[in-house]
Regions:
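Beta-strand-rich ligand-recognition modules
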Residues: 683-702, 710-779
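Glycan-recognition and processing domains
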Residues: 613, 617-700, 764-780
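Structural motif
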Residues: 37-43, 79-85, 124-126, 172, ...
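Bacterial N-terminal signal peptides that target proteins for export
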Residues: 1-8
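Feature activates predominantly on carbohydrate-active enzymes
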Residues: 28, 43-44, 49-52, 56-58, ...
Length: 780
């Protein structure tokens, strides 16, 4: 019996030891690691790599890792180049074959090697950039907590980038909604973080006046050189966006432009790309622009021999496009590095097809705006467009993953257009998709939240970002997830006070509160408007003037009996925090934002979400009528504006809740912008399309209908392909065109409405014809 007991005790003991060893293998503890860096990694990247590892780990763990080029420590983080055989006497792990990621440009491999009781985490790269990207992957995947940094053991991960060019624009100018307030140190940290997520290029917009922004901490003429130095520190390409003189036909414009550029080139320690937009701004013909660029290239190469000249075809008409490509085909200039695809360029796939193979094709996608832009938010509720506007905090991982894969394939890479820190998540997403377009955005977001917020909240915060994007999907009043999103972020906010000063954290929480406040306001104000119309329904009994007075008093409760002020106060609280942390300018008056469209989301947080401003103006007009009958008739029309009766239908074009509209615009200029964002027009009039399409089913085939259209200018309407003649044709805003529709055209109860585009190419789009409202009214 004693022998049996002794056997089981020994067995249990051995099992415990094995279990402990197994437990220990679950993580690779780097808390006491020493850093070893190859001498082949030249300065400044050797110092940069060491400082990144030491500083970023210390920020998150309070651990101070050592940098000693020896193997005395039991745990080592070793940085080496793939072509090296040994690192301070230790063999560098190598794989067979020439097609490994770590042998390709910018590629790297992270590999855990265990030798007895010693652990080495290798970062092996093809070049010095690859070293930084390998460090980035290490820091993004490591779990860093107080006094501890761990990684999954036996890691063997490698990758090289799919796209050679992966960058973002950071124009140090007043137009930016935040970083015109940044110091050199803030730019250094931010560029570092972008590099750690895979970026390799940064584009500035030089030649700014010192007094052009009230937020400048440093003269822009100095900052444009400092940004060049930062790029050199991180081995990132430094690009500049520098338009040509507006009109090169003006005397001395050509030479003056060259002289200004030369002075800038001479003082930059690093410069890799010069992007000269063909238009936007400027309207130079390529016959004038190309000689200017040729001369510019000679000056550029005098100071930066390997830098390239790039040009876009923005705003080019057909003749200019043909001239440009004929020039490339006939002259084949070696001084031109490539063409940039930007807004109002020819279609991206056509531009790639026409571009000779010797030239690179760069994408210039707008990831910073939500309306009146390159990539509008799909199915966005008007209430958001009126309040959050064009530059809100806009993490949209799912939308941008789809758009990246749709468009970037025609190019050799990208430098995104950005004008603020509000699109930070989008930048990281694009950088990572530039490495691998098949990456799951869920994995990208998890690395983002783990690196910036820590492993404990990473999963929930990543979900919270997806939820913020979901908040913007479709009609607000039908979106049940908005309050759930707020609940998640409130919980994260309450339980993680240590993140209170983290600007990325502040942005996301602010959006959650803002969205919820808009939802509450919209529900409240829509109810007030519906109740105001019920008062107008009593106009025959009350009298027109009394009914208007009572209705206006009721609908204006939106301004006197406020809702959800606790949510609004939190939004303003975070507006102040963001101004203090990163200089975010969320208000023109309060924080000196450049303009109302430039991120000033606080200034529009209480913009009317019902038609009270419009009703006030309409009631003033009606008050001038001399006939009570006229007043009552107009009030009846207003009351039933969106309710044409049983068997009839109304659609506000481009509204998220329009049921019959089948068309979408591709640039979101369907949200009107006038009077600096404070339009008093009817809300439906502020949404439009130029040539919408609508579709109806199950109409009464035995009934005639009337199609009523509101908008501006022409309306060349077709019903099931047949052009209809109008019985009424008014062209002003909130006036009407009416088209009789006979039952002969809808024998099967199916109707498609379309609009031919009038010949208005000579007009600015703001003056072109558009459709705002469409009624299909059943005739009795």
């Amino acid at each position: 019996m004693k022998k049996q007991l002794k056997f089981w005790l020994v067995f249990i003991g051995i099992g415990s030891i094995l279990s402990c060893e197994k437990e220990q293998q679950k993580t690779l503890d780097l808390s006491q690691a020493n850093i070893v860096i190859s001498a082949q990694i030249k300065s400044p990247i050797q110092e940069t790599a060491a400082s990144i590892l030491v500083e970023e780990i210390k920020k998150r763990t309070n651990l101070q890792l050592g940098w000693n080029n020896n193997w005395d420590s039991k745990t080592t983080i070793a940085l080496a180049l793939a072509n090296e055989k040994e690192l301070f006497g230790t063999k560098v792990p190598a794989r067979d074959g020439e097609n490994t990621p770590e042998s390709k440009k910018e590629g790297y491999r992270i590999f855990h090697q265990k030798d007895g009781d010693k652990n080495t985490l290798w970062v092996i790269a093809a070049d010095k950039r690859g070293i930084l990207y390998g460090i980035g992957k290490l820091l993004r995947t490591a779990k860093m907590e107080n006094s501890k940094i761990t990684l999954n053991p036996n890691i063997d991960f490698s990758e090289s980038p799919e796209y050679a060019l992966r960058g973002h624009q950071f124009g140090y100018r007043n137009t930016a909604n935040s970083w015109d307030a940044w110091t050199v140190e803030q730019f250094d940290q931010h560029f570092r973080e972008q590099v750690l997520f895979g970026a390799n290029s940064f584009e500035n917009i030089p030649f700014q006046e010192a007094d052009s922004s009230p937020h400048f901490k440093i003269d822009p003429q100095i900052m444009e050189v400092e940004l060049s130095k930062i790029c050199e520190k991180y081995d990132a390409d430094y690009w500049v966006w520098t338009p040509a003189p507006h009109d090169l036909t003006i005397k001395n414009a050509h030479q003056d432009g060259l002289a200004e550029q030369e002075a800038f080139y001479a003082k930059c320690p690093r410069l890799d790309g010069v992007f000269v937009p063909g238009g936007d701004p400027g309207e130079n013909h390529p016959s004038k622009l190309m000689p200017y660029l040729k001369d510019l290239s000679e000056i550029l190469h005098k100071y930066h021999p390997n830098a390239g000249i790039w040009v876009s075809l923005q705003g080019f008409n057909k003749e200019k496009v043909e001239y440009f490509f004929n020039y490339l085909n006939s002259e084949s200039p070696d001084w031109l590095k490539g063409v940039v695809y930007g807004p109002s360029s020819p279609p991206i796939e056509l531009e790639r097809e026409m571009l000779p193979k010797k030239y690179l094709h760069r994408f210039y996608p707008d990831i910073t705006h939500t309306v009146r832009c390159h990539y509008p938010v799909d199915n966005w509720d008007q209430a958001y467009a009126l309040t959050l506007g064009r530059e809100p905090i806009n993490p949209q991982p799912l939308m941008y993953t789809q758009l990246f894969n749709r468009d970037t394939k025609y190019t050799d890479g990208f430098i995104t257009y950005s004008d603020g820190s509000h699109d930070d998540l989008n930048k990281v997403l694009w950088s990572q998709l530039g490495w691998d377009s098949k990456k799951n955005p869920k994995d990208i977001l998890h690395e983002y939240t783990q690196f910036f917020f820590g492993p404990k909240v990473a999963e929930k915060a990543a979900q919270g970002i997806f939820d913020l994007e979901k908040n913007w999907d479709g009609p607000i009043l039908e979106n049940e997830s908005i309050k759930e999103t707020l609940s998640l972020w409130k919980s994260l906010e309450d339980n993680n006070p240590d993140l209170a000063n983290n600007w990325r954290w502040q942005q996301l929480i602010m959006r959650a509160y803002y969205d919820a406040y808009i939802q509450d306001r919209l529900a409240y104000e829509k109810r007030l408007e519906a109740e105001a119309y019920e008062i107008l329904d009593q106009a025959n009994a009350l009298g027109a003037d009394k009914a208007m007075s009572d209705a206006l008093e009721h609908i204006n409760k939106a301004d006197t009996e406020l809702v959800s002020q606790d949510l609004k106060e939190k939004v303003f609280e975070y507006g102040e925090k963001l101004f203090q942390s990163i200089g975010a300018q969320t208000s023109v008056d309060k924080y000196q934002a450049r303009s109302a469209e430039r991120g000033a989301i606080l200034d529009f947080i209480d913009y009317p979400l019902n038609n009270r401003w419009w009703l006030e103006d309409e009631f003033k007009k009606i008050g001038e009528y001399t006939s009570e009958a006229e007043k009552l008739a107009r009030l009846e029309f207003i009351r039933n504006y969106e309710s044409p009766g049983e068997g009839s239908f109304y659609d506000n074009i481009s509204s998220a809740d329009a049921r019959h509209v089948t068309s979408k615009t591709d640039d979101a200029i369907d949200f009107l912008w006038e009077n600096n964002g404070l339009s008093r027009k009817r809300l439906s009039t502020q949404l439009f399309q130029f040539t919408p399409t609508l579709e109806y089913r199950d109409l009464d085939p035995d009934s005639d209908y009337l199609i009523r259209v509101s908008g501006y200018g022409e309306a060349l309407l077709r019903a099931n392909g047949e052009r209809l003649k109008p019985a009424k044709y008014e062209k002003g805003f909130e006036e009407f065109k009416e088209f009789p529709l006979t039952k002969a055209l809808i024998k099967d109860g199916h109707l498609k409405i379309s609009f031919d585009k009038p010949d208005e190419e000579h007009l600015n789009w703001r003056k072109q014809s558009r459709v705002t409202d469409v009624w299909l009214i059943k005739q009795q």
